[in-house]
Amino acid sequence: MMSKMGAMFVLLLLFTLASSQQEGDVQARKTRPKSDFYRALPRSGSTCTCFTSTNCQGSCECLSPPGCYCSNNGIRQPGCSCTCPGTG
């Protein structure tokens, strides 16, 4: 009787460890593509200089095209950059 209970405990332990390992693998696969996606996005303002105040209201000096303006980079990258028509 004790050997049956011991065998059941070992099987339960092995099953628990195997399922938790699979869950960790799924989590690792979920996070990686998101960072690759953000890294692949084109960064606007690479040929521009943004002369700004603290709230990103200023002028841009760009090689091309005309009509660029200063804007916030966003929550993940604080600061300002030039946003130009057709560059996103």
Swiss-Prot record:
Keywords: Acetylcholine receptor inhibiting toxin, Amidation, Disulfide bond, Hydroxylation, Ion channel impairing toxin, Neurotoxin, Postsynaptic neurotoxin, Secreted, Signal, Toxin. Expressed by the venom duct. One of its GO terms (molecular function) is toxin activity. It is found in: Secreted. Coiled coil: none annotated. Residues 1-20 form the signal peptide. The keyword Oxidoreductase does not apply. Residues 21-43 form a propeptide. Contains 5 disulfide bonds. The predominant peptide contains 2 hydroxyprolines, while 2 minor peptides contains 1 and 3 hydroxyprolines. The modification Threonine amide is found at T87. One of its GO terms (cellular component) is extracellular region. It comes from the Eukaryota. Belongs to the conotoxin S superfamily. Alpha-conotoxins act on postsynaptic membranes, they bind to the nicotinic acetylcholine receptors (nAChR) and thus inhibit them. This toxin shows high activity on alpha-9-alpha-10 (CHRNA9-CHRNA10) (IC(50)=9.79 nM). It also shows weak activity on alpha-3-beta-2 (CHRNA3-CHRNB2) (IC(50)~1 uM), alpha-6/alpha-3-beta-2-beta-3 (CHRNA6/CHRNA3-CHRNB2-CHRNB3) (IC(50)~1 uM). The toxin binds to the same or overlapping binding sites than conotoxin RgIA (AC P0C1D0). The cysteine framework is VIII (C-C-C-C-C-C-C-C-C-C). Negative results: shows no or weak activities on 5-hydroxytryptamine receptor 3A (HTR3A), and alpha-1-beta-1-delta-epsilon (CHRNA1-CHRNB1-CHRND-CHRNE), alpha-3 beta-4 (CHRNA3-CHRNB4), alpha-4 beta-2 (CHRNA3-CHRNB2), and alpha-7/CHRNA7 nAChR. This is Alpha-conotoxin GVIIIB. It comes from Conus geographus (Geography cone).
